[in-house]
Amino acid sequence: MSIDINWEAATSGPDGEALAERIRSFIHDKFQQIALPRFIRSVEVNSFDFGTVRPQLQIKDLCDPFEDFYEEDEGDEDFSDDQDGAPKHPPTIATERSGAGTWQAEHPSFVAGRLPGGIESRDIPAPSKEDLLASRPMRSPMSFGESLNPYFFPRAGTPGIPGGTSNLGYYMPLGGMSGTQTPLASVPRGPFSPGLRDSSVYGDIHNPPARDYPRPVHRQTDTDIDSGHSRPSTADTLNSINSQRISNPALSHPHSSNESHPDTRDHSPPPRRMHEKKPDDLQVLCQLRYNGNIRLSLTAQVLLDYPMPSFVGLPLKLNITGLSFDGVAVVAYIRKRVHFCFLSPEDADTLLGSEESNETGYIPGINPIGGGASGGAASSRRRDDSLLRDVRVESEIGRKEDGKPVLKNVGKVEKFVLEQVRRIFEEEFVYPSFWTFLV
């Protein structure tokens, strides 16, 4: 079924001008976020016009909307945070630290007998680095496949890592970390941070060590340090402390052999919040073909490197005077919302079948695709092409000789601008990206 569009009524008048200005502003903002090559100083989008040629639409299918269209937004007014199944926010680091401080305040006598100085509402000062280094012997080359003690990494400044890498042994084992366990909650902490202390210096603050958790000694021989089977690692001891005190599995070692305390938090991403499906939800798949005179005017500053680099910038005006388009549009109506996007050629062929089974020849000037022995080759070429075809560009700069611009970089600028226009279109309008309109 074909659809006739009153293109003039949709693109003219105050509403059409406002829509054209919004499109111009949108493309301009996207160009400001692009890293420009050395020979281009800036790109500005000056105007946008819909042209006079209307696109042609043919309805291909009516079906149920895609699952992604039912996903709730964070600020959706129709969604209630109190409903069952709503994901809970994990506790922050500040909350976890306050829990440890509360326990210390409730047991001052026990901690005062184990640790020097009063604790009150302040954190217990950590021992100096000189004392720690003096209590540890020189070690032989370590095995980086094992868990590493954090005190073997001094707080020397590491380029790009403020504060050094002294907390590497706590939560970032070099023996391979699972991609599903991200120690974000442990980033601000280290061996000298308040709230957590190394058990090899202080012991277990919350409870005396049980028989299942051997207490590490202060001094270790080279054999003990390099062998992962002769002593419990610091991460293992911290795992037992964290499981008893704050129940935070994000701080535990991913390869810990202690399995007596199961994780209380799921490492998988939170489930998506979805709209409820209704019988009146509808999705339309349309074949959209366009070969018109849509116009887009841009100005780029081209840098001249003679007699010195970036000597002067010349304005280069680029006018996109028309383009050809062939693609499948998706329009879905769900609960007073209209979702709109285009399908990539591969998705369109999967959903609607290959080009050989579709009718062709909608618009003069676009070669029909399919038919005969050349249909497969044409379909293969279509998969490699962009949805935007045959973008026609006119450039204006300085004096021309034999119909060609004098500057050598004009061709590079045109190619760069066209590539970015295609990239913006595909990233913003091709599924799984889509636009939602309230109706």
Swiss-Prot record:
Subcellular location: Mitochondrion outer membrane; Endoplasmic reticulum membrane
Segments of skewed composition (Acidic residues): 71-84
Disulfide bonds: none
Compositionally biased tracts (Polar residues): 230-255
Main location class: mitochondrion
Annotated membrane topology: Peripheral membrane protein
Gene Ontology cellular component annotations, sorted alphabetically: endoplasmic reticulum membrane; ERMES complex
Matching PROSITE patterns: SMP
InterPro entries tied to this protein: Mdm12 (IPR027532), MMM1_dom (IPR019411), SMP_LBD (IPR031468)
Residues annotated as domain SMP-LTD: 1-439
Region listing for Disordered, in residue ranges: 71-104, 182-278, 362-385
Alphabetical keyword list: Endoplasmic reticulum, Lipid transport, Lipid-binding, Membrane, Mitochondrion, Mitochondrion outer membrane, Transport
Record-level Gene Ontology MF annotations: lipid binding
Pfam families: MMM1
Membership in a protein family: Belongs to the MDM12 family.
Free-text comment about domains: The SMP-LTD domain is a barrel-like domain that can bind various types of glycerophospholipids in its interior and mediate their transfer between two adjacent bilayers.
Known function: Component of the ERMES/MDM complex, which serves as a molecular tether to connect the endoplasmic reticulum (ER) and mitochondria. Components of this complex are involved in the control of mitochondrial shape and protein biogenesis, and function in nonvesicular lipid trafficking between the ER and mitochondria. MDM12 is required for the interaction of the ER-resident membrane protein MMM1 and the outer mitochondrial membrane-resident beta-barrel protein MDM10.
HAMAP family: Mdm12 (MF_03104)
Self-association and partners: Component of the ER-mitochondria encounter structure (ERMES) or MDM complex, composed of MMM1, MDM10, MDM12 and MDM34. A MMM1 homodimer associates with one molecule of MDM12 on each side in a pairwise head-to-tail manner, and the SMP-LTD domains of MMM1 and MDM12 generate a continuous hydrophobic tunnel for phospholipid trafficking.
Protein name: Mitochondrial distribution and morphology protein 12
Organism of derivation: Uncinocarpus reesii (strain UAMH 1704)
